[in-house]
Amino acid sequence: MASPTVLATVILLALLLYHYVIQPYFLSPLAKIPNAHFTSPLTSAWIERRRNAGKEVLTIYNAHRKHGSVVRLGPDELSVNSLSGLRTIYTGAYEKHQWYNDLFVNFHTDNMVGMVHNEPHARQKRMLSKIFSKSFLQDSVDLRDISRIVLSQRLLPILRRVATDRETINVLPLFQAVGMDFTSAFLFGTRNATTYILQLPEWQQWLDEYEQFKVMSRDDRCDGFIESWCLSLCRRMEKNERPNDVPVATSPVVYDQLRDSLEKDPDDRPRELAIASELLDHLVAGHETTGISFTYMMWELSQHPDLQTELRRELLTLSPQFKFPAASEKTDTLLEIPTPSSIDSLPLLDAILRETLRVHSPTPAPLPRATPHTKDGVSLDGYNNIPGGIRISSSSYSLHRIEEVYPESEKWQPRRWLEPGQGKIHDMRRLFWPFGSGGRMCLGSNFALQEIKMVMAAVYTNYTTEIVDDEGIEQDLAFISLPVGRKLMLKFTPVEG
């Protein structure tokens, strides 16, 4: 007869075997879902190692290519790569995973991106949704004047000088500065906004500080340069300081709207920090993601001179045209610019931008959500009874490479948007995911698209571009995905005639 000690040991081993092997591998509601790695049912260590090594995006993409639209990444984590999955998870308003709150909260104070629960997010989104709507932005006199100032007095004069002197320029930091100046002017008004396009050495210092900011703890961020800088911008507004000498003073559209809304409908957050936390998120996204989009759009166009010519023909149909005076015709007057709606209606420009955002999504990484707790669980692509609290996500990188929707998906082919197969354009648009989808879709998507189209129309009306140095142009595939080499050196040549 076995001793009590031996019997206890056998029982313990049996329980451990059941808990750590039999249950997760064979009895878990997730057991039928293909495993991305043989250890996925047991531990998250494998996927965490891939994340920490910066290989999460490609790892998940390859897992979907091998196993299909739903894969298990860890004991309580799934990745989904299908249109039906998007509808269930994101249109179905699954709440965000705690990961967002850990990573994106500024000043120890919630903002929309960092809010896990849908209700407070919806409340704050209602405060700002009108001023970020496409109709409001296209009709905005303030945004029109911001565009005229940034283009006429900052960007185009720099490109004219670079072209005249036959210099090359790193367009990544320059166009990140364009994004920052556009965004900060819409938030704070032109008299209180940044002017980093004209201060590129100072801007590079800011970018260096921001690289450190991205890996800091919450506590270190609060004492650091970036949060202090943003808070100083907000406090200048409260003191009614207006340091910039500009030809047109625009309204602080976003700042005023958010401040007034929080005054009328306060919550338990300190109002100054609630405003600063939200606006810092806008400033971060507004310079980084648009700067990436500008860079890869110019990189692709620079490899296709014939397409540049075709795009220019399309741009010259605008009225007024974006023609900027040559160096011998210097003028201090602001450009008259085409309406945003007329620029938005240009099919080739739209196709080039869409294809750039598809292939070179600035945010290629998974956007995690948590499955809701329901009586019978949830169903995804034929897998049923998925319990609540499971980390679940999709990523634009994988979605944008579904071959059935985007044939030869690794190739940059703008004409796929102009000449889609019968009925295919609907799926192409539904799977187009650089801004997410559903109630948590990026609030600034319309602003970003309008800005990028406006700026690129101005650039390619006046210049051709040519690559001088694109070493390290491949994306690092981080959450916000920059070129590995942090540069793209281009030559700008004025268009004759």
Short names for language-model regions:
Residues 193, 305-308, 428, 441, ...:
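Cytochrome P450 heme-binding "Cys pocket" and the immediately downstream C-terminal segment
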Residues 289-302, 455:
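Short, small-residue alpha-helix embedded
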Residues 481-497:
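C-terminal helix/juxtamembrane-tail motif
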Residues 97-106, 120, 139-294, 310, ...:
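Cytochrome P450 heme-thiolate monooxygenase catalytic core
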Residues 50-60, 224, 228, 232, ...:
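Conserved cytochrome P450 K-helix E-x-x-R motif and the immediately C-terminal K′/meander segment
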Residues 2-123, 148-153, 157, 273, ...:
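N-terminal membrane-proximal hinge/A-helix region immediately C-terminal to the signal-anchor transmembrane segment
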Residues 377, 394-423:
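Conserved cytochrome P450 K-helix/beta-meander segment immediately N-terminal to the heme-binding cysteine loop
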Residues 205-208, 303-363, 387-390, 413, ...:
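Cytochrome P450 I-helix active-site segment
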